[in-house]
Design a protein with these regions (language model features):
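Conserved beta-sheet core of the metallophosphoesterase superfamily
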Residues: 95-161
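Short, glycine/charged-enriched secondary-structure capping and boundary segments
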Residues: 21-24, 51-55, 75-77, 100-101, ...
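Active-site neighborhood of phospho(di)ester-bond hydrolases with catalytic His/Asp-centered motifs
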Residues: 7-10, 36-42, 59-64, 86-88, ...
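N-terminal active-site segment of His-dependent metallophosphoesterases
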Residues: 1-58, 67-73, 151, 184-186, ...
């Protein structure tokens, strides 16, 4: 079974609350490289809708609290062995509350529940079900947070295994913050995996500490020999 690459985005609000998606995101999100695109509503404009739809032949969206037209508020998508539920999230009170999300999940029996509305990226697990919020891909403001960092989720699904990449663009440094987790269908926990760059940095730090320790040992040995020599000369 081939892996399925799934983009999850929410709350674009382009151009109402944000002029556009950051160019760094657009260089990553190339048309026809993704098998599925799942949008959680509040896209903002026809142009934004068309851009998302151009990324994959399999595009799905749900109705946000600012969307108009005949769009479903709930949707289920089957990808591999995973039954994925989609809602915007304004139906959940308090917004983003895990217990409230769990109630919705139990009613519909989804393996993964995707929701937005808070504009803040979040991943949780409860009772062997996974809850993912991709944040706002444009970094548009919300009533909960005035200036969120732009973010989105990429999921790699293969059989009953999932890898979830969280992409966050730090507005101050203009650098990506990338995290990776792995989980299996029906598991009650997930594994946080450090990226290669972080591992390389830790290895460099360990090597630096080792060099400093060896240098200190040599200096201590020299001082010890020097003290012994001084004692003998007395």
């Amino acid at each position: 079974m081939n892996p399925e690459l799934v983009l999850v985005v929410g709350d674009m609000f382009v151009p109402q609350r944000s002029p556009d998606i950051d160019e760094q995101f657009k260089t990553i999100l190339i048309p026809n490289k993704l098998q599925h695109v799942l949008s959680l509503g509040n896209i903002g404009s026809r142009e934004s809708y068309d851009w998302l739809k151009s990324l994959s032949n399999d595009f799905h969206t749900v109705k946000g609290d600012f969307d108009e037209g005949d769009i479903s508020e709930k949707k289920v998508v089957q990808i591999g062995e995973f039954k994925i539920g989609m809602i915007h999230g304004h139906q959940v009170l308090p917004w983003g509350d895990l217990d409230a999300l769990t109630t919705i999940q139990r009613e519909l029996g989804w393996d993964i529940l995707l929701s937005g509305h808070t504009h803040q990226i979040d991943i949780k697990v409860k009772d062997k079900k996974f809850y993912i919020n991709p944040g706002s891909i444009s970094g548009s403001f919300s009533y909960l947070i005035a200036d969120p960092n732009p973010s989105f989720i990429l999921m790699v699904l293969q059989g009953e295994e999932a890898i979830v990449y969280s992409y966050i663009l730090n507005d101050k440094s203009q650098k990506f913050e990338l995290s990776k987790i792995e989980f299996s269908k029906g598991a009650n926990e997930y594994k946080i995996v450090k990226d290669e760059e972080e591992n390389e940095e830790e290895e460099e730090e360990d090597e630096d500490k080792k060099e400093k320790s060896e240098k200190k040992e040599k200096e201590d040995k020299k001082n010890e020999i020097k003290e012994e020599s001084n004692e003998e000369s007395k």
